[in-house]
Amino acid sequence: MPEFYDEAAEQQRPTGDALITSEDPNHPANLIPSLCAKFWTLGWVTGTGGGCSIRDDDLVYIAPSGVQKELMKHTDIYVMSISEQDPNHNKLKQRTYLRSPPCYKPSQCTPLFLAAFTRRGAGCCIHTHSQWAVLVTLLLEAQGPGKDRVFEINNIEQIKGFGRGMTKTGNLGYHDTLRIPVIENTPHEEDLTEYLEEAMDKYPDTYAVLVRRHGVYVWGDNVHKAKTQCESLDYLFQLAVEMKKLGLPWISEVAQIAPQRT
Protein backbone atom coordinates (compact mmCIF):
# COMPACT_ATOMS: atom_id res chain seq x y z
CA MET A 1 0.00 0.00 0.00
CA PRO A 2 1.42 3.44 -0.88
CA GLU A 3 2.34 5.63 2.08
CA PHE A 4 0.56 8.99 2.08
CA TYR A 5 0.90 10.25 5.65
CA ASP A 6 3.07 13.32 6.24
CA GLU A 7 2.91 14.67 9.80
CA ALA A 8 4.42 18.06 8.91
CA ALA A 9 1.97 18.53 6.03
CA GLU A 10 -0.95 17.59 8.28
CA GLN A 11 0.01 20.27 10.82
CA GLN A 12 -0.05 22.91 8.06
CA ARG A 13 -3.21 21.61 6.42
CA PRO A 14 -6.22 23.95 6.06
CA THR A 15 -9.54 22.93 7.58
CA GLY A 16 -13.24 23.21 6.76
CA ASP A 17 -14.17 25.24 3.68
CA ALA A 18 -10.56 26.34 3.28
CA LEU A 19 -9.94 22.84 1.94
CA ILE A 20 -12.15 23.49 -1.09
CA THR A 21 -11.56 27.23 -1.63
CA SER A 22 -9.06 28.20 -4.31
CA GLU A 23 -8.81 30.41 -7.40
CA ASP A 24 -6.74 27.72 -9.11
CA PRO A 25 -8.90 25.98 -11.76
CA ASN A 26 -6.77 22.86 -11.31
CA HIS A 27 -7.48 22.63 -7.57
CA PRO A 28 -9.32 19.30 -7.05
CA ALA A 29 -12.43 21.02 -5.65
CA ASN A 30 -12.69 23.11 -8.83
CA LEU A 31 -11.55 20.42 -11.23
CA ILE A 32 -14.06 17.75 -10.17
CA PRO A 33 -17.14 19.89 -11.02
CA SER A 34 -15.51 20.94 -14.30
CA LEU A 35 -14.74 17.35 -15.26
CA CYS A 36 -18.17 16.06 -14.26
CA ALA A 37 -19.86 18.75 -16.36
CA LYS A 38 -17.85 17.51 -19.36
CA PHE A 39 -18.62 13.88 -18.53
CA TRP A 40 -22.34 14.74 -18.40
CA THR A 41 -22.21 15.98 -22.02
CA LEU A 42 -20.78 12.57 -22.98
CA GLY A 43 -23.61 10.70 -21.24
CA TRP A 44 -21.25 9.24 -18.65
CA VAL A 45 -22.89 10.66 -15.51
CA THR A 46 -26.55 10.99 -16.46
CA GLY A 47 -29.20 11.30 -13.75
CA THR A 48 -26.71 11.87 -10.89
CA GLY A 49 -24.99 8.55 -11.66
CA GLY A 50 -21.24 8.07 -11.81
CA GLY A 51 -18.63 10.18 -10.09
CA CYS A 52 -15.05 11.33 -9.80
CA SER A 53 -12.42 11.55 -7.09
CA ILE A 54 -8.96 13.15 -7.02
CA ARG A 55 -6.15 12.42 -4.58
CA ASP A 56 -3.71 15.17 -3.58
CA ASP A 57 -1.11 13.37 -1.47
CA ASP A 58 -3.03 12.28 1.65
CA LEU A 59 -6.16 14.31 0.86
CA VAL A 60 -8.99 12.85 -1.21
CA TYR A 61 -11.65 15.04 -2.87
CA ILE A 62 -14.91 13.29 -3.80
CA ALA A 63 -18.07 14.25 -5.68
CA PRO A 64 -21.15 13.68 -3.48
CA SER A 65 -24.02 11.26 -4.01
CA GLY A 66 -27.26 12.43 -5.57
CA VAL A 67 -25.99 15.65 -7.12
CA GLN A 68 -26.70 16.56 -10.75
CA LYS A 69 -23.17 16.31 -12.06
CA GLU A 70 -23.51 19.10 -14.64
CA LEU A 71 -24.59 21.53 -11.89
CA MET A 72 -22.03 20.60 -9.25
CA LYS A 73 -20.13 23.35 -7.42
CA HIS A 74 -16.89 23.29 -5.46
CA THR A 75 -18.90 23.69 -2.26
CA ASP A 76 -20.49 20.27 -2.91
CA ILE A 77 -17.18 18.41 -2.53
CA TYR A 78 -16.29 16.03 0.30
CA VAL A 79 -12.71 15.90 1.59
CA MET A 80 -11.09 13.10 3.59
CA SER A 81 -7.64 12.04 4.71
CA ILE A 82 -6.51 8.56 3.64
CA SER A 83 -4.26 8.16 6.67
CA GLU A 84 -7.14 8.88 9.05
CA GLN A 85 -9.34 6.05 7.72
CA ASP A 86 -9.56 2.85 9.74
CA PRO A 87 -8.55 0.01 7.36
CA ASN A 88 -10.82 -2.35 9.32
CA HIS A 89 -13.86 -0.19 8.55
CA ASN A 90 -14.67 -0.33 4.85
CA LYS A 91 -18.30 0.69 5.04
CA LEU A 92 -19.41 4.15 3.96
CA LYS A 93 -20.96 5.11 7.30
CA GLN A 94 -17.70 4.33 9.09
CA ARG A 95 -15.65 6.84 7.08
CA THR A 96 -14.46 10.11 8.59
CA TYR A 97 -14.39 13.35 6.62
CA LEU A 98 -12.41 16.56 7.06
CA ARG A 99 -15.04 18.53 5.17
CA SER A 100 -18.66 17.61 4.31
CA PRO A 101 -21.23 19.65 2.35
CA PRO A 102 -24.38 20.36 4.39
CA CYS A 103 -27.03 18.95 2.04
CA TYR A 104 -25.62 15.79 0.44
CA LYS A 105 -24.57 12.26 1.31
CA PRO A 106 -21.12 10.74 0.77
CA SER A 107 -20.71 8.95 -2.55
CA GLN A 108 -21.32 5.21 -2.48
CA CYS A 109 -18.27 5.03 -4.76
CA THR A 110 -15.96 6.23 -1.96
CA PRO A 111 -14.49 2.85 -0.91
CA LEU A 112 -13.91 1.94 -4.56
CA PHE A 113 -12.11 5.21 -5.19
CA LEU A 114 -9.99 4.56 -2.11
CA ALA A 115 -9.10 1.11 -3.44
CA ALA A 116 -7.65 2.74 -6.57
CA PHE A 117 -5.68 5.21 -4.45
CA THR A 118 -4.32 2.79 -1.86
CA ARG A 119 -3.81 -0.30 -4.03
CA ARG A 120 -2.70 1.41 -7.24
CA GLY A 121 -1.31 4.73 -6.00
CA ALA A 122 -3.71 6.44 -8.42
CA GLY A 123 -4.13 10.20 -8.41
CA CYS A 124 -7.62 10.17 -9.93
CA CYS A 125 -10.46 7.67 -10.33
CA ILE A 126 -13.48 8.12 -12.59
CA HIS A 127 -16.71 6.12 -12.49
CA THR A 128 -19.06 6.32 -15.47
CA HIS A 129 -22.41 4.84 -16.40
CA SER A 130 -21.48 4.91 -20.08
CA GLN A 131 -23.99 3.04 -22.25
CA TRP A 132 -21.10 1.60 -24.26
CA ALA A 133 -19.53 0.13 -21.13
CA VAL A 134 -22.86 -1.44 -20.15
CA LEU A 135 -23.43 -2.80 -23.65
CA VAL A 136 -19.99 -4.43 -23.70
CA THR A 137 -20.79 -6.27 -20.46
CA LEU A 138 -24.08 -7.44 -21.98
CA LEU A 139 -22.33 -8.70 -25.10
CA LEU A 140 -19.85 -10.59 -22.93
CA GLU A 141 -22.72 -11.98 -20.85
CA ALA A 142 -24.37 -13.28 -24.02
CA GLN A 143 -21.26 -15.36 -24.77
CA GLY A 144 -22.04 -17.50 -21.74
CA PRO A 145 -20.34 -18.42 -18.46
CA GLY A 146 -16.57 -18.52 -18.59
CA LYS A 147 -16.39 -16.06 -21.48
CA ASP A 148 -17.89 -13.08 -19.69
CA ARG A 149 -15.18 -12.22 -17.15
CA VAL A 150 -12.84 -10.07 -19.23
CA PHE A 151 -13.11 -7.72 -22.20
CA GLU A 152 -10.25 -8.20 -24.67
CA ILE A 153 -9.40 -6.29 -27.83
CA ASN A 154 -6.24 -5.93 -29.93
CA ASN A 155 -4.87 -4.43 -33.14
CA ILE A 156 -6.67 -1.12 -32.64
CA GLU A 157 -4.71 2.17 -32.57
CA GLN A 158 -6.51 3.61 -29.52
CA ILE A 159 -5.06 0.83 -27.34
CA LYS A 160 -1.91 2.98 -27.26
CA GLY A 161 -3.74 5.24 -24.81
CA PHE A 162 -3.14 2.79 -21.94
CA GLY A 163 -0.09 2.21 -19.78
CA ARG A 164 1.43 -1.26 -19.60
CA GLY A 165 0.86 -1.47 -15.85
CA MET A 166 1.59 0.18 -12.53
CA THR A 167 5.11 -1.27 -12.23
CA LYS A 168 5.92 -1.13 -15.96
CA THR A 169 7.12 1.63 -18.24
CA GLY A 170 5.57 2.83 -21.47
CA ASN A 171 2.19 2.31 -23.06
CA LEU A 172 0.57 -0.63 -24.80
CA GLY A 173 1.25 -0.93 -28.51
CA TYR A 174 -1.04 -1.32 -31.48
CA HIS A 175 -0.57 -5.11 -31.60
CA ASP A 176 -0.96 -5.61 -27.83
CA THR A 177 -4.12 -6.97 -26.23
CA LEU A 178 -5.99 -4.72 -23.82
CA ARG A 179 -7.74 -6.68 -21.05
CA ILE A 180 -10.40 -5.20 -18.76
CA PRO A 181 -11.88 -7.50 -16.08
CA VAL A 182 -15.62 -7.63 -15.42
CA ILE A 183 -17.18 -7.96 -11.96
CA GLU A 184 -20.80 -8.64 -11.04
CA ASN A 185 -23.03 -5.79 -9.94
CA THR A 186 -24.42 -5.53 -6.39
CA PRO A 187 -27.56 -3.77 -5.07
CA HIS A 188 -25.39 -1.27 -3.16
CA GLU A 189 -22.34 0.25 -4.83
CA GLU A 190 -20.05 0.14 -1.79
CA ASP A 191 -20.48 -3.66 -1.72
CA LEU A 192 -18.59 -3.83 -5.02
CA THR A 193 -15.36 -2.96 -3.22
CA GLU A 194 -14.10 -6.46 -2.41
CA TYR A 195 -14.82 -7.65 -5.96
CA LEU A 196 -13.03 -4.64 -7.45
CA GLU A 197 -10.04 -5.37 -5.22
CA GLU A 198 -10.06 -9.04 -6.28
CA ALA A 199 -10.05 -7.96 -9.94
CA MET A 200 -7.12 -5.62 -9.23
CA ASP A 201 -5.20 -8.51 -7.69
CA LYS A 202 -5.99 -10.87 -10.58
CA TYR A 203 -5.19 -8.27 -13.25
CA PRO A 204 -2.36 -6.20 -11.75
CA ASP A 205 -1.72 -4.31 -15.01
CA THR A 206 -5.29 -3.09 -15.52
CA TYR A 207 -6.31 0.55 -15.17
CA ALA A 208 -10.03 -0.19 -15.25
CA VAL A 209 -12.73 -2.60 -14.08
CA LEU A 210 -16.10 -3.08 -15.75
CA VAL A 211 -19.20 -3.66 -13.62
CA ARG A 212 -21.80 -5.81 -15.34
CA ARG A 213 -24.95 -3.96 -16.43
CA HIS A 214 -23.68 -0.90 -14.52
CA GLY A 215 -20.61 0.91 -15.86
CA VAL A 216 -16.85 1.16 -15.42
CA TYR A 217 -14.20 2.40 -12.99
CA VAL A 218 -11.06 3.89 -14.55
CA TRP A 219 -8.02 5.29 -12.74
CA GLY A 220 -4.66 6.81 -13.56
CA ASP A 221 -1.54 8.23 -11.96
CA ASN A 222 -3.02 11.72 -12.30
CA VAL A 223 -6.12 13.47 -13.63
CA HIS A 224 -4.73 13.71 -17.16
CA LYS A 225 -4.02 9.97 -17.40
CA ALA A 226 -7.30 8.92 -15.79
CA LYS A 227 -9.29 11.18 -18.13
CA THR A 228 -7.49 10.17 -21.33
CA GLN A 229 -7.67 6.47 -20.45
CA CYS A 230 -11.39 6.81 -19.72
CA GLU A 231 -11.91 8.54 -23.07
CA SER A 232 -9.86 5.90 -24.88
CA LEU A 233 -11.76 3.10 -23.18
CA ASP A 234 -15.15 4.56 -24.07
CA TYR A 235 -13.99 4.88 -27.68
CA LEU A 236 -12.97 1.20 -27.67
CA PHE A 237 -16.23 0.10 -26.05
CA GLN A 238 -18.27 1.90 -28.70
CA LEU A 239 -16.06 0.47 -31.43
CA ALA A 240 -16.46 -3.02 -29.95
CA VAL A 241 -20.26 -2.74 -30.00
CA GLU A 242 -20.22 -1.62 -33.65
CA MET A 243 -17.74 -4.38 -34.54
CA LYS A 244 -20.07 -6.96 -33.00
CA LYS A 245 -22.94 -5.65 -35.15
CA LEU A 246 -20.80 -6.24 -38.24
CA GLY A 247 -19.67 -9.67 -37.13
CA LEU A 248 -16.07 -8.52 -36.66
CA PRO A 249 -13.97 -10.16 -33.93
CA TRP A 250 -12.41 -8.15 -31.11
CA ILE A 251 -9.31 -10.35 -31.18
CA SER A 252 -7.66 -10.62 -34.59
CA GLU A 253 -4.43 -11.67 -36.27
CA VAL A 254 -2.67 -8.77 -37.99
CA ALA A 255 0.83 -9.13 -39.38
CA GLN A 256 3.41 -6.83 -37.80
CA ILE A 257 5.20 -4.95 -40.59
CA ALA A 258 7.43 -2.71 -38.47
CA PRO A 259 9.38 -3.21 -35.23
CA GLN A 260 7.86 -2.37 -31.86
CA ARG A 261 9.68 0.55 -30.21
CA THR A 262 9.36 1.65 -26.58
UniProtKB/Swiss-Prot annotation:
Location of region: Disordered: 1-24
Active site: 157
Positions of substrate binding: 109
Subcellular location: Cytoplasm
Disulfide bridges in this chain: none
Chemical reaction(s) catalysed: 5-(methylsulfanyl)-D-ribulose 1-phosphate = 5-methylsulfanyl-2,3-dioxopentyl phosphate + H2O
GO terms for biological process, alphabetical: L-methionine salvage from methylthioadenosine
Domain of life (superkingdom): Eukaryota
Chief subcellular location: cytoplasm
Binding site for Zn(2+): 127, 129, 214
Record flagged with keyword Glycoprotein: no
Molecular function terms from GO: methylthioribulose 1-phosphate dehydratase activity; zinc ion binding
Cofactor, how bound (note): Binds 1 zinc ion per subunit.
Keywords: Amino-acid biosynthesis, Cytoplasm, Lyase, Metal-binding, Methionine biosynthesis, Zinc
Class of this enzyme: lyase
Record EC number: 4.2.1.109
Cofactor requirement: Zn(2+)
Pathway: Amino-acid biosynthesis; L-methionine biosynthesis via salvage pathway; L-methionine from S-methyl-5-thio-alpha-D-ribose 1-phosphate: step 2/6
A cellular component annotation (GO) from this entry: cytoplasm
Role description: Catalyzes the dehydration of methylthioribulose-1-phosphate (MTRu-1-P) into 2,3-diketo-5-methylthiopentyl-1-phosphate (DK-MTP-1-P).
NCBIfam families reported for this sequence: salvage_mtnB
Stated name of the protein: Methylthioribulose-1-phosphate dehydratase
Source lineage: Eukaryota, Fungi, Dikarya, Ascomycota, Pezizomycotina
Gene name in the database record: MDE1
